[in-house]
Amino acid sequence: MSLPEHSPLGKPSAYKTEYDASLLFPIPRQPKRTEIGLPEGKPVPFFGVDIWNAYELSWLNLKGKPQVALASFIIPSDTPNIIESKSFKLYLNSFNQTRIASPEALQQLLHHDLSEATGGTVQVRLVTEADLGKQKMGELDGLLLDRLDIEVDRYEPAPELLSADQQESPVEETLVSHLLKSNCLVTGQPDWGSVQIRYVGAPINQEGLLKYLISFRNHNEFHEQCVERIFMDVMRECKPVKLAVYARYTRRGGLDINPFRTNFNTAWPDNKRNARQ
């Protein structure tokens, strides 16, 4: 099993400039899911995707002329593995001096390698120079929790802060906070994010929810793992009928990671970059 501490994170790395798929370092999802009460071999109570965006992708055409593009990768949450982010960066950089016939050929190669590493089917989209000006930005929709004037003293995940008034009629609500911060599982480097929680069910106590989200501030876990922990804690403590959790994290090493988890059928998020990304 690939363990996070064996990944390139926190270690000096030689940057290869010619294509090398072996740089990708997959990490199994299951151990962290076991931690949040999801045993191996049983269905998980959510589905979704991890949306990655790469802003530093370059290669050479067959004449040796550099090419650049943005790339997005949609990794289903039911793949057995995630990709450790530094290894992803090193892999993408390995294309820098690699001659490739066309953007389409690169897209096919990325699809193959990432699908192999994750154990599923990864969608790949390239945005070449001609379309860069068409890229749009947008913020997460929803009622801003950060408006609340609260006192905070918990900085490790505290699901007991969550509650919902089960005596009230169900509501449909979308809540947003830009105060999510966690830390890399291996290096402890800060990860900054915005999070959107959509639900149908008993009204969730908003002050408690904001305190809970802030409680991740000193917590060490990868982005995907944090979002699944949030999903499970809200489900257990607040018991919504429907729940979707979406986080957009700021980029590091030219990559941002945006996990989405839901228990009801809905369109995947539209992947608009927000102002902090």
UniProtKB/Swiss-Prot annotation:
GO terms for cellular component: cytoplasm. Pathway: tRNA modification; tRNA-queuosine biosynthesis. The keyword Secreted does not apply. InterPro entries: GTP-CH-I_C/QueF, NADPH_dep_7-cyano-7-deazaG_red, QueF, QueF_N, QueF_type2. Keywords: Cytoplasm, NADP, Oxidoreductase, Queuosine biosynthesis. Its main location: cytoplasm. Its EC number is 1.7.1.13. GO terms for molecular function: preQ1 synthase activity. GO terms for biological process: queuosine biosynthetic process; tRNA modification. It comes from the Bacteria. The keyword NADP applies. The active site is at residues 184, 191. It catalyses: 7-aminomethyl-7-carbaguanine + 2 NADP(+) = 7-cyano-7-deazaguanine + 2 NADPH + 3 H(+). It is found in: Cytoplasm. NADPH binds at residues 85-86, 252-253. Substrate binds at residues 83-85, 223-224. Catalyzes the NADPH-dependent reduction of 7-cyano-7-deazaguanine (preQ0) to 7-aminomethyl-7-deazaguanine (preQ1). PANTHER family: NADPH-DEPENDENT 7-CYANO-7-DEAZAGUANINE REDUCTASE (PTHR34354:SF1). Homodimer. Belongs to the GTP cyclohydrolase I family. QueF type 2 subfamily. This is NADPH-dependent 7-cyano-7-deazaguanine reductase. It comes from Cupriavidus necator (strain ATCC 17699 / DSM 428 / KCTC 22496 / NCIMB 10442 / H16 / Stanier 337).
